[in-house]
From Swiss-Prot:
Cellular-component GO terms for this entry: plasma membrane; proton-transporting ATP synthase complex
Gene (UniProt): atpB
Subunit structure: F-type ATPases have 2 components, CF(1) - the catalytic core - and CF(0) - the membrane proton channel. CF(1) has five subunits: alpha(3), beta(3), gamma(1), delta(1), epsilon(1). CF(0) has three main subunits: a(1), b(2) and c(9-12). The alpha and beta chains form an alternating ring which encloses part of the gamma chain. CF(1) is attached to CF(0) by a central stalk formed by the gamma and epsilon chains, while a peripheral stalk is formed by the delta and b chains.
UniProt membrane topology term: Multi-pass membrane protein
Full protein name: ATP synthase subunit a
Predominant location category: membrane
Source organism: Arthrobacter sp. (strain FB24)
InterPro entries, sorted: ATP_synth_F0_asu, ATP_synth_F0_asu_bact/mt, F0_ATP_A_sf
Keywords, ordered alphabetically: ATP synthesis, Cell membrane, CF(0), Hydrogen ion transport, Ion transport, Membrane, Transmembrane, Transmembrane helix, Transport
Function: Key component of the proton channel; it plays a direct role in the translocation of protons across the membrane.
CDD domains reported in the protein's UniProt record: ATP-synt_Fo_a_6
Transmembrane segments: 38-58, 99-119, 126-146, 162-182, 191-211, 224-244
Length: 266
């Protein structure tokens, strides 16, 4: 991906990569599939990778698990216990483990693409994918709330308990905007913006290193070493953030579900 950004033109000026580098052309030769880009291919590949791994991990279950079975059980246990059970709790949490499990590993794999050489493109550096996931969570949250509480859920979600009546005209519009308008937008943009910004910084650093190495000035060539060290540190930090964002997105989903299930007690 970094190689897509050519830093030097004939004028010798440094031209850093921009957001447009994230919008790749279609990878198929015919016009009927103009929307099928590298991101779409990676998304499909992520489903295959996740399904293959967990099918293999669960294929031959043993009392004393092998390495693959142990890894699969540990991955499942992390989402089940550390997110679903801890946040949702009660007897209802198991219903939502498949959703949370799928979200976590789908986001994780698509984010980790950005740290893999030759791929180096997190799928959610394009906002479309993040919007789709946030929409799924948003509709699920509303459906759970309505199923649990009926149509009065919309009142429970917008009229906080214990608030003086004279303050409600101010609080209710804020709650409506916060819960039904801002929530899905921030849920998606948090993932998209983090992936875009982190990867863009790494791209700029890579382009800067190439530009500095090509200069005749020895001081500029030496500076490229410092930029390289910084780029490596940023690369490692971005890999950590990739995993963290998968956790944060899934954790917020669990919090929304818990809120829908227990809206009458909030």
């Amino acid at each position: 991906m970094i190689a897509l950004a050519l830093p030097a033109q004939d004028s010798g000026e440094f031209n850093p990569p921009g957001i447009e580098e994230m919008h790749l052309p279609a990878i198929l030769p015919w016009g009927a599939a103009d929307g099928f880009s590298k991101q779409m291919l990676l998304v499909i590949l992520s489903v295959v990778i996740i399904a293959t791994f967990f099918l293999l991990a669960a294929r031959k279950q043993q009392l004393v698990p092998g390495k693959l079975q142990f890894a699969g059980e540990a991955a499942y246990g992390f989402v089940r216990n550390s997110i679903a059970k801890d946040i949702i709790g009660g007897k209802d949490f198991m219903k939502y483990v498949p959703l949370l499990f799928s979200l976590f590993f789908f986001i994780l794999v698509n984010n980790i693409y950005g740290a893999i050489p030759l791929i180096q493109l997190p799928s959610f550096s394009h906002v479309g994918g993040a919007y789709v996931l946030a929409a799924i969570v948003y509709l699920t949250w509303i459906a759970i709330g309505v199923k649990k509480n009926g149509i009065k859920y919309f009142k429970l979600a917008t009229v906080p308990t214990g608030v003086p009546v004279y303050i409600l005209p101010i609080v209710i519009p804020i709650e409506i905007i916060s819960n039904f308008l801002v929530r899905p937008v921030t849920h998606s943009l948090r993932l998209f913006a983090t992936m875009l910004a982190g990867h863009l910084i790494v791209m700029i650093a890579g382009s800067g290193i190439e530009y500095l190495v090509m200069q005749e000035n020895i001081l500029l060539k030496g500076t490229s070493v410092l930029v390289l060290v910084g780029a490596i540190a940023m690369y490692m930090l971005e890999a950590l953030i990739m995993a963290l964002q998968a956790y944060v997105f899934t954790l917020l989903t669990a919090i929304y579900i818990e809120g829908a299930l227990h809206a009458d007690s909030h």
